[in-house]
C-alpha cells in the first residue's frame, strides 16, 4: 500500500529548509519522496523559501540570493531525507529545462511533472 501525504507546513512556498525536529518520518516508511516546486527557481530565497534564513545558512549565501536548480538540489542533498525526488509544477519548456538541470545534481531517481496537469517524466 502507498499513502502520499503532503504535510510539511511550508506555508504554500515551493522550497523549504527543515527545522531540526522535522520532518517526522515513521520508522516503517520504506520510501521517502522529496517534493520540490520548480516555481521556486529564479526567485530570491527570501521570497520563495519557508525558513529562508535557515535555507540561506545551509546554502552558505544570503537571503537575497536567487535560487538556481543547482542550489535547490544542494539543499535537498544536504538535508538527506529522501531517496527519491519529485519536481512538481513543471508545466513549460523552461520549467522542464530547469528540472533537468536540477535532476543532474541528484544520484537518486528523479521524476518531474505537474500534479495539476497529471503529467510526469522520469529524468533519471
Which role does the model predict for each range below?
Residues 1-2, 8-109, 116-118, 122-124:
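Conserved catalytic-core segment of NTP-binding enzymes
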Amino acid at each position: 500500500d502507498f499513502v502520499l501525504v503532503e504535510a510539511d507546513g511550508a506555508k504554500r512556498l515551493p522550497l523549504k529548509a527543515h527545522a531540526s525536529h522535522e520532518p517526522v518520518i515513521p520508522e516503517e516508511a520504506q520510501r521517502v519522496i522529496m517534493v520540490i516546486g520548480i516555481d521556486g527557481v529564479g526567485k530570491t530565497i527570501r521570497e520563495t523559501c519557508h525558513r529562508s534564513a535557515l535555507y540561506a545558512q545551509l546554502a552558505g549565501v544570503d537571503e537575497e540570493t536567487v535560487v538556481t536548480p543547482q542550489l535547490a538540489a544542494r539543499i535537498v542533498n544536504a538535508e538527506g531525507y529522501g531517496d527519491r525526488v519529485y519536481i512538481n509544477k513543471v508545466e513549460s519548456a523552461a520549467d522542464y529545462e530547469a528540472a533537468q538541470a536540477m535532476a543532474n545534481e541528484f544520484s537518486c531517481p528523479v521524476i518531474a511533472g505537474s500534479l495539476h496537469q497529471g503529467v510526469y517524466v522520469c529524468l533519471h
